[in-house]
Amino acid sequence: MQSLAEVSAPDAASVATAEELATLKQRMDEALALLKRAKLGGSERRNLYELPWYVIIGPPGSGKTTALMNSGLDFPLAAQMGAGAIRGVGGTRNCDWWFTDEAVLLDTAGRYTTQDSHAQVDKAAWLGFLDLLKTQRKRRPIDGAFIAISLSDLLLGSDAERAAHAQAIRARIQELYQQLGVRFPIYVMLTKFDLVPGFMEFFDSLNREERAQVWGMTFALDDGKSAEGPLAVFDSEFALLEQRLTARLVERLQQERDPARRDLVYGFPQQFAALRECLGEFLNGVFKPNPYEERPLLRGLYFTSGTQEGSPIDRLIGSMAQSMNLDRQHLARQTGTGRSYFIERLFREVAFGERGLVGTNPKVERRRKWLTIGALSATALVVLAVTAVWIASYRANQSYIAAVDQRVDPLARGIESLSPAQRDVLAVLPQLNAVQNLAGDAPSWAEGYGLYQGDMLGEESASVYRKLLIAVFAPRLVTRIEEQLRSGGSSDFLYEGLKAYLMLGSPDHYDADFIKAWISLDWERNLPRDLSPEQRQALHAHLDALLERRPPSARLDQDLVEDLRRQLQQLPVAQRVYDRVKRQRLPKDVPDFRISDAAGRDAPLVFARKSGKPLTDPLSGFFTYRGYREVFLTASLSQAGTIAEEQWVLGRDLNDAGDAANLALDVRRLYFQDYLRQWDDLLADLTVVPITNVTQAADVLRILSGPTSPFRKLLEAVARETDLQKGDRLVAAQVKKAADGTVDKLKQRLGSLVGQEEEGAREQPRQVDSDPISAHFAELNSLVSKGEGGNEPAPIDSLLEDMNALYVQVSAMAGASGDSLLGDAKNQVAAAASRVALSAERQPPVVQGLVKNVVNSTTSSMMGSVRNQLNAAWISDVVSVYRQSLAGRYPIAAGSSRDATLEDFGHFFGAGGVMDSYFRQYLQPYVDTSASTWRWQPGAAQKLGINPGVLHTFQRAAAIRDAFFRSGGMQPTVRFELKPVTMDAAISQFILDLDGQQLTYDHGPSRPVAMQWPSANGLGVVRLTVTPPPSSGRSGLTLEGPWAWFRLLDQSDLERGNSPDRFTLRLRIDGSSIACELRASSAFNPFKSRVVSGFSLPERL
């Protein structure tokens, strides 16, 4: 409401403008009333135009009002109005009216000129003031204008300020010319002349008469030929004023005895001369002619002083002291006498004496002139017109009769040429148009005035036109309908066409409006598209004229009629009635059903359509409770009655009331089938919006389970629209029991239409089935029902509470991270989701589907968050460690020259290491490790969204752990025994040294030697020595590094034995070989299948 008030409230500027204009109008009305009542200058009452009006404009504080008060003019109304007659002392608020015996002076507010405080208000008030002047004195709004500008503004103002004053005054002058429409003289008053240093001292000796004189320059009347206008002589005129001052200077110096005053007298002509430049610039800025503006009529420039008292003098003298090199206090001691200088004769002798210079408004004068001429001309024209009209009427009627005679013969020949075989209505259109217009159009003004002959000719023309319509137009319409019926079409098309056809042949069933509608529809669809609108209008006009009175019955093709009836009787009557009812336009107060309206404004946040249709897509209001009660029940029985009345179309009757009742029941059954299909399709198409993350899942659950749940609203709306027995549980027996007043009346009407027989003689109608709609949706309706009295909670409340509990858990999970996300938060969400899913199992299918959709989407989004967290931990905790310490190093990369450190290897693969910890913390609950090949628990891979192949990586890591870290911890330890078996005969002895652990063999008895990798001393050196050296000259092999033993195994042949802990190792040196038996300490050992080599990690799970 507050925002509405802000919008509707008027702004302050508009209010202020209205108030200002109202004040100006009030002052104008007061002034005009005074002028009408007062006797100015004698007993003669003067009107508005007898006294000249002058407007005074200028910036605020320019001394306009002071000049008027000290002008010496007589104000005769002061005695009548008291002090109030002299308004504006201390500043003019709007506009003050000064009534003298010689003129009316309008003193305007200075802000109207500058418009620099409240520009919008001041401009509107100024223009409104000009409109008032123009309204009251249309011919001559003003007789002149005074421009008042203070010399203090010119002396103390900057160049920019003076330019702004000049621009503002120039704009006001142009607005005066444009708004008032007259060219008036302009007088510039330079006020506060006394503020020029030395003024008082120089002119102090003037007497009253001398002070009343005009001191300035009056220009010659501007003829518009000079490019500079009157300002061309400004410099010369100003020089004359300087000469006057200089001529009087010696006299004044001799008269003055005070040295300080003599100094000021002496400097005054110089100070005055210093005004020339700034005055010239200012006047050029205001009055310099411009070809794009009205040329001002500048009459003169005059210096005045109204009073010499008050603080402005002291301030100005202080500001001037420095420029004159005088002592400030020396100047400040000069005070004025408060007398006026050079004002009085300026008004009386200069301005008022030239009151005739202003012209009148040319637009107003031209209007007055033309009004006078028009009145005289109109009188003469009336006399001439009356005489001419009778002559023109007589001649026009003679021409009219001759024109009708000329049209008759060609028309008769055209009608005779028409062939009965022609079927095209357009072929007869020219003849019909000609006969229809035979008598011509409505009489013109020249044919009237009592001499018109068209009425007699028109009656005969109308008779001929009617006969032509029946003879050539009607048969073509009948033939066209026959063509339509023979061409086939839908059952409804043939039925309606046959009805129109039979109406033309039977007076008993004639309906002009129906025939007209059928033919018009055919023309609209089948006439050539290039047919002009005029031709179409003519055809419709002829059709209206033909059917206005029933034409003679047409001869019908009975074979065609019988054939059509046989076709039409194949469609059940009930279906025909239902199709008619369904095509009816719904009343405006029976709205369509929209999910967006039913579920509320939050519906788009939670619901969507599987088909992609918007939630605003309507289900016809025909299939709503109101559509059923207010449209279908009425329309079905009405249409059943109509079909009964139209059984003549099919050539049969419905004479039995039972048949009519059964027909209504069949129509109702078709409606219910359609009703169910529409609602089932709509609800089956409803789903929950796609949920992509846990945060969105929480939002959806919050909205669905909240106080304004769109889920509850939608179900309640569906229940309202599908409980057709609401308010009248006996509606299913309406035909039999008349439980509804409206239905009972329509049933009686139907009975009267089809005819009622005696109670005992007629066949009883079939029993009505129970309402299938209410039965079909009974479970859904009971879900939102609040029980008897509406005081018990609806069953849906329990479901919504479970969904709210799920929302709470999901919301908590949305803010969880790390172990919490993968642990308790996930488990609690899963438990809450299971409760909701269990509750949904007991709900109607539509509710069950929607709720399960929400639960599944929520679970999926939860697992998606879990998957994201798993991947984040995988990359940061596993992959990054693997890349830094193991990737590309031996033994992971078999051919790499770089070794992984045993510490890094143990940290990654050891018991409690990186791989083992990640698996136990995140994945172990979802994996079955009991089988030889690990597998996911049922459904776990799909829920987590993890590639099933990831388990192979973890199982292989576990195999590495079991092979290298049997004792636990993160230090790899491998124990085994080596026993020489055979050795080449060329070798007498070989020695294997593994970090100080030696195995020696010289073809004697062999004994197993226990070894451990890595050894306690941690040298990381393996040496294999043979004696004697082979022919190549190399006697042995040395490998270094923490993985030297396994590098030796890679260079040798290692074959599995008959048990997982026994292997045959064949060592080779330049073609010589030594075979040993390798016995591992455990079946879980690193010697089988190269358990480490080729191990890799996926980038993401």
UniProtKB/Swiss-Prot annotation:
Cellular compartment(s): Cell inner membrane
Knockout mutant characteristics: In the deletion mutant, TssB1 is still recruited to the structure containing TssK1, but the assembly of TssB1-sheath is aborted likely at the nucleation stage.
Pfam families: IcmF-related, IcmF-related_N, IcmF_C, IcmF_helical
Keyword Transmembrane found: yes
GO cellular component: plasma membrane
Keywords: Cell inner membrane, Cell membrane, Membrane, Transmembrane, Transmembrane helix
SUPFAM superfamilies, per database record: P-loop containing nucleoside triphosphate hydrolases
Membrane topology per record: Single-pass membrane protein
TM region(s), chain numbering: 371-391
Function: Core component of the type VI (T6SS) secretion system that plays a role in the release of toxins targeting both eukaryotic and prokaryotic species. Plays an essential role in stabilization of assembled TssK1 structure at a fixed perimembrane site.
Name of the protein in question: Type VI secretion system component TssM1
Organism: Pseudomonas aeruginosa (strain ATCC 15692 / DSM 22644 / CIP 104116 / JCM 14847 / LMG 12228 / 1C / PRS 101 / PAO1)
Gene, per the UniProt record: tssM1
